[in-house]
Amino acid sequence: MSGRLPFEEQLLSGQLRPSAEEREYIAGVARRLLDAINASGKATGMVVGSIARNTWVKGDRDLDVFLLFSPEMPREALETEGLALARSIARAFTPMFHEKYAEHPYINANVEGIDVDLVPCYNVASAEHIQSAVDRTPFHTRYITDKINGLTDDVLLLKQFAKAGGIYGSDQMTEGFSGYLCELLVLHYGGFAPLLAAAAEWRPPVIIDIGKHAAKKFDEPLVVIDPVDPRRNVAAAVSLDRMAEFVELARGYRDAPSEEFFRIRKEYPCCPADLAALLASRGTSLYAVTFATPPFIEEIVVPQLKRSTGAISDLLDRSGFAVHHAHYRMGPGRCMLLFELIIDELPPIRRHEGPPVWNRVNAEKFREKYRTSPLPGPFIENGRYVTEVPREFTRAGDLISSPAILSVGTGRHVRESLGKDWCVLEGADCWQEEFSGFIATFFSRRSPLVRIERDRPGRE
């Protein structure tokens, strides 16, 4: 494509475009899976996703195969019979498969080194008749395949750009840009470079309606109306922060384009000694809450982790323990909620404000309740009663270790896991090998562009 930077062409030919051999290998596996599905006589097989649309980055061996059933089949039957067929297909190719759950269950399998999802759905005539969220995916594939000609390389550049910036993926942890969203943005703006030129000037809300057929209003900062379903915002998962990071990256790349914008950076773990030294230099206190990961998919657990972290932070703040930063991580076996506090010890007394004196009924109740207290008060200040009361928790660790954290809005599945088994760690003892990368990034927060600028040779 004319106008493309030389290093962009080198990236495409060397790192991003799948080789002919890789394409044929995956196509062969896909053909055999489709033949097995079609031979069952129960469903029709269809390859969807980036592999079907020819927009997959070299090395991303994720194959999405849909099992299309008659729309006359009851929903319950689709879940049971669809899962049974997907399981039998997987079993014919590999012993390495297991059930996963989204809106309804599907099978994930490793077939000859390829990560395969076997997903039952309805074979509906149009997107207007979808009965479940996955039913629209075949229409996405057809739409992009029909229109992406000449822009495939631009999609590959955008996907790698977003991956390197840490904003690729619509999962709950990332809250970023899905592959389908990347494809639609390239289509709408006509290429990678025109997209970045436009994104550098974005100011939310940004509304893109490719089909000019939006069927409702949306509140998200970035709105991209699905051209096959006017009721859906393809960018609904994109958080305000991820959108801002994309804008920042677009500006940075246009100002000083380089390969650094496409280089994926590793998450470097810290060691216990590093953590101890870091905490000593910062003068803050660190607490971790760990517990068994609830047996549900990320889309269910992660929002509850986010809610739980916020609720416990609010509890700490209300109790006088100022939270400087808090975050969460879902691991395969355990979860961690991490809290950095400005202060973690307080005096045994605290100030307690009562009602205004002229609120007679409540004022007299307050005075009567506290008048025999050995602590100062009640006294009048600015027209209302004030007294001193004993502080329930003088140490943040005692509060976090108490049943009080089960009474805040943690989310049902997280609360159940906490109720069975939770562990509170303090200071350098918060270090856990499985969370060492998470802990390191917790203390090295920087925007994507700042990370790139700091990594450039010669930059201080």
UniProtKB/Swiss-Prot annotation:
SUPFAM superfamilies reported in the protein's UniProt record: Nucleotidyltransferase, PAP/Archaeal CCA-adding enzyme, C-terminal domain, PAP/OAS1 substrate-binding domain
Co-factor requirement: Mg(2+)
This protein's record includes keyword Nucleotide-binding: yes
Database matches in InterPro entries: CAA_C, CCA-adding_arc, CCA_tRNA_nucleotrans_2, NT_2-5OAS_ClassI-CCAase, NT_sf, NuclTrfase_I-like_C, Polymerase_NTP_transf_dom, tRNA_NucTransf2
Biological process annotations from GO: RNA repair; tRNA 3'-terminal CCA addition
EC primary class: transferase
Reactions the enzyme catalyzes: a tRNA precursor + 2 CTP + ATP = a tRNA with a 3' CCA end + 3 diphosphate; a tRNA with a 3' CCA end + 2 CTP + ATP = a tRNA with a 3' CCACCA end + 3 diphosphate
Highest taxon listed in the record's lineage: Archaea
EC number: 2.7.7.72
Binding site for ATP: S50, R53, H140, K159, Y168
Keywords, alphabetical: ATP-binding, Magnesium, Metal-binding, Nucleotide-binding, Nucleotidyltransferase, RNA repair, RNA-binding, Transferase, tRNA processing
Residues binding CTP: S50, R53, H140, K159, Y168
UniProt keyword annotation of Manganese present: no
GO molecular function terms noted in the UniProt entry: ATP binding; CCA tRNA nucleotidyltransferase activity; magnesium ion binding; tRNA binding
Ligand binding (Mg(2+)): D62, D64, D117
Description of how the protein assembles with itself and partners: Homodimer.
Sequence similarity: Belongs to the tRNA nucleotidyltransferase/poly(A) polymerase family. Archaeal CCA-adding enzyme subfamily.
Additional facts recorded: A single active site specifically recognizes both ATP and CTP and is responsible for their addition.
Main function: Catalyzes the addition and repair of the essential 3'-terminal CCA sequence in tRNAs without using a nucleic acid template. Adds these three nucleotides in the order of C, C, and A to the tRNA nucleotide-73, using CTP and ATP as substrates and producing inorganic pyrophosphate. tRNA 3'-terminal CCA addition is required both for tRNA processing and repair. Also involved in tRNA surveillance by mediating tandem CCA addition to generate a CCACCA at the 3' terminus of unstable tRNAs. While stable tRNAs receive only 3'-terminal CCA, unstable tRNAs are marked with CCACCA and rapidly degraded.
Protein name: CCA-adding enzyme
Species assigned in the record: Methanoregula boonei (strain DSM 21154 / JCM 14090 / 6A8)
Taxonomic path: Archaea, Methanobacteriati, Methanobacteriota, Stenosarchaea group, Methanomicrobia
